[in-house]
Amino acid sequence: MAKISLIVNGNPVTANVDPRTLLVQLLRENLHLTGTHVGCDTSQCGACVVHVDGKAVKACTLLAVMADGHEVKTIEGLAADGAPLHPMQEAFREHHGLQCGFCTPGMIMTAVDLVHRKGHDLSEQVIREELEGNLCRCTGYQNIVQSIAAGAKAMAKSDLA
């Protein structure tokens, strides 16, 4: 077992994990943060995207021991303290950017990272290119793209830019 310490959604966490434990397993099984989904186990679907030190990472590709000393944010920790939803989450709700919802946490975490890297004025082409690592089996992506564009603009108006 390996002892790791990290910050998850602003809270210090210490855990003893098998060195082969994936970050997604630590989050879901040990910390009960089940918003991070496992869709493929092969790093293709993007349902497991979280932020590590502010950057989007597929949690199924990262060993938990590699997150030792780092800050991890999951969909559960995305909204500001006291706020019911992050502006990107609100945009997905308002623009019907989900159907079954399984891919939604990963889409939203990827979208927030996209805004941080590329800014608030995102073209449809840029959004679609950036979503290549995220799969949705239910939609044609149009409402997801619209949700991300609206969420990016909403983030510009908030202090979560």
Report residues per predicted region.
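Signature of N-terminal electron-transfer/Fe-S-associated modules in redox systems
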Residues: 1-161
